[in-house]
Amino acid sequence: MGEGHMIDCKPDKADRVDAAGLQAFVSRIISDHAGKEIIYLCIGTDRSTGDSLGPLVGSLLEERGVAGVMGTLRIPCDANTLPRLAQTLPDDAIIVAIDACLGRAESVGLFLASRGPLVPARSVNGGFGAIGTYSIAGVVNENSLKPYWTLQSTSLYRVMRMAGEIADAIASAVARQASQYFKSNAERMGAYE
């Protein structure tokens, strides 16, 4: 169970997007999969500033009442728990993997959005397989020869801002989808009265 979500393949090419582009990307996912279970797999740890993006997003989503969140500051989806959690993912669920990454200087503060999986801990040679139906990687800092140190010394302000942008995009898309669902149900019920 869940094994189909963790595969050893090269992820699809990701699009580099800002907060508005991320909003459009997430809205498409939610509208394309209306009625299906969507799990937001927020990968990372609360023990590294740069790598806390995923758990921060998970906590913000939980606070906003978004269902299907795995990985928060309280219960992170980190190197120790990811393999076990991946096995519990339902085979028919849509998985949106969310993680921090290092990248080019011009990409810092932006997001890599992909209609395919991401490889957790790639910049630090974590050895994980790809995971996710879709993925969002937040470029929290510039890639360097010392990725662990770079993640540790990443700006908390930047990480928190980016986590807020991801959570805002998801929460507002979920709310819009719910509103459309209730509106169409109300119209349908009104048509039968």
Model-derived regions, located:
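N-terminal catalytic or cofactor-binding beta/alpha core of small enzyme domains
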Residues: 1-193
